Design a protein with these regions (language model features):
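A short Gly-Trp-Pro
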Residues: 1-16, 21-145
């Protein structure tokens, strides 16, 4: 590890669903308070899930007491991403990119942060990301945006 990496500021946050059944901790560098960018995307899944995403490495996320296994997952289109939510209270938790080394965790789940003070990066996913096309799995429905 280089000296720059060793001195890079980071902070660990606790996060959870609304009912508390799903709990995790994630470490971000730089910390949210120091301008860590939060993705605000307008694609169909981000809009409907209310996602404001941060992207910690999987090694920097700790799921407590089997919480990841208790997540309910939804997959569509390429079926390579789990949209994770709590099966009890329905809170949208984020995205498990199954073939990647990172998660997309919804900043809305992080305890004790003020969403109005965060630094956002907007993404026009509605117009710049390829449409999911058939979301039904039957080959008959058009994409819903």
């Amino acid at each position: 590890m280089s000296t720059d990496e060793a001195q890079k500021p980071s902070k660990t946050y606790d996060a959870s669903c609304h009912c508390g059944s799903i709990k995790l901790s994630l470490t971000l560098s730089p910390p949210l308070e120091d301008g860590h960018k939060v993705l605000n995307c307008n694609c169909s899944i981000c809009r409907r899930s209310g996602y404001l995403l941060v992207y910690p490495e999987k090694k920097d996320v700790t799921w407590h007491d089997g919480s990841r296994e208790r997540c309910t997952n939804y997959r569509f289109n390429t079926k390579t991403k789990d949209q994770m939510f709590c099966g009890s209270c329905g809170s949208s938790l984020g995205i498990d990119f199954l073939n990647e080394t990172y998660y997309g965790i919804s900043a809305r789940t992080i305890d004790g942060i003020d969403l109005d003070t965060l630094t956002y990066k907007k993404l026009d996913g509605l117009n710049k990301v390829s449409p999911a096309q058939d979301l039904s799995g039957t080959g008959t429905k058009e994409a819903s945006t």
